[in-house]
């Protein structure tokens, strides 16, 4: 945004063929339509990965969020039917600097632009995404809207809508803080992933009940590669229904929304912990473990999203490059074991096992007296590095060493 001679912000001009991004704080960016025409609003966030845009688009944790890609050139490799992490695109909107006009990849089945349009995803291109991201880093993520096509026109008068009219639509969008979204992205019925790879066709080593709060497809696959039979269950499952699956361990997945609004899932998790089931949580699952143990959660200024975040495993001293997608974090003390606050230490000792080296945000929790641990990032690496794949081995070891009687 530029300033005129009077020092006030100059509002850029636009016409009906443009696409307009309006931020909650009044910032306006004019670019070209990308994907579908129309209107979309949501929380605007940025992702720092150079690759993996198809996995980003289909990650349910991006529900109701407009995603800005920091890497300028997007779409080179097109889209295919193998890389999606779920059955649909979940982002509310998509912003890129320089979309590729050509597709060049042996697996490509179509272009990203066409795929976005086919799925009704309103996008915007050819704006200064670096400038936009720098603004979001300093001001924080916020509500925003992308408007193009008929959404720019006042249907009553035929005139272009004013910035004030567009901004009103943005401000009518719910804030992410306070939203409960995991139910709208969860599976509606249970499905099972059988052991694969070297374990294909064999009896499973372990049975896992994976509660889908927005699960990515690669996560149960990583467990299946290690000989697990994974029952992916809806967020509405009861503890009795989990028990009927006779699992060796319970997993809570990633997902969208504010963990403070996930009261039923937190109570379900406490029942899992009370019963002594080995527990592993990723992302939203980490936040829910934190709250189940009695810690608070809080919203980050601009979050961690991308495939290049450095995280230190405090139990080994090893530094990993990891994939992230979270806007909330657990508020727990770093550098010491403490009694879990819930009910005067009912769950025993716990400590922060991982931290982000960029900002010291809590990236993992390890319980000492019960078989439970979690991480804030994504060891399934879809997309992203495989540095943290050992965490699935750690979960299998936990199930091996803490099998319930009768298993």
UniProtKB/Swiss-Prot annotation:
Keywords attached to this entry: Amino-acid biosynthesis, Arginine biosynthesis, ATP-binding, Glutamine amidotransferase, Ligase, Nucleotide-binding, Pyrimidine biosynthesis
Highest taxon of source: Bacteria
Pfam families recorded: CPSase_sm_chain, GATase
Record-annotated active site: 283 (nucleophile), 378, 380
Domain Glutamine amidotransferase type-1: 207-405
Record field: catalytic activity: hydrogencarbonate + L-glutamine + 2 ATP + H2O = carbamoyl phosphate + L-glutamate + 2 ADP + phosphate + 2 H(+)
GO molecular function: ATP binding; carbamoyl-phosphate synthase (glutamine-hydrolyzing) activity; glutaminase activity
Region of interest called CPSase, as start-end residue ranges on this chain: 1-203
One annotated GO biological process: glutamine metabolic process
InterPro entries assigned to the protein according to its UniProt record, in alphabetical order: Anth_synth/Amidotransfase, CarbamoylP_synth_ssu, CarbamoylP_synth_ssu_N, CarbP_synth_ssu_N_sf, Class_I_gatase-like, CPSase_GATase1, GATASE
Binding site for L-glutamine: 61, 255, 257, 284, 287, 325, 327-328
Pathway, per record: Amino-acid biosynthesis; L-arginine biosynthesis; carbamoyl phosphate from bicarbonate: step 1/1; Pyrimidine metabolism; UMP biosynthesis via de novo pathway; (S)-dihydroorotate from bicarbonate: step 1/3
Family listed: Belongs to the CarA family.
Quaternary assembly: Composed of two chains; the small (or glutamine) chain promotes the hydrolysis of glutamine to ammonia, which is used by the large (or ammonia) chain to synthesize carbamoyl phosphate. Tetramer of heterodimers (alpha,beta)4.
HAMAP family: CPSase_S_chain (MF_01209)
Protein name (database record): Carbamoyl phosphate synthase small chain
Originating species: Bifidobacterium longum (strain DJO10A)
Gene from which this protein is expressed: carA
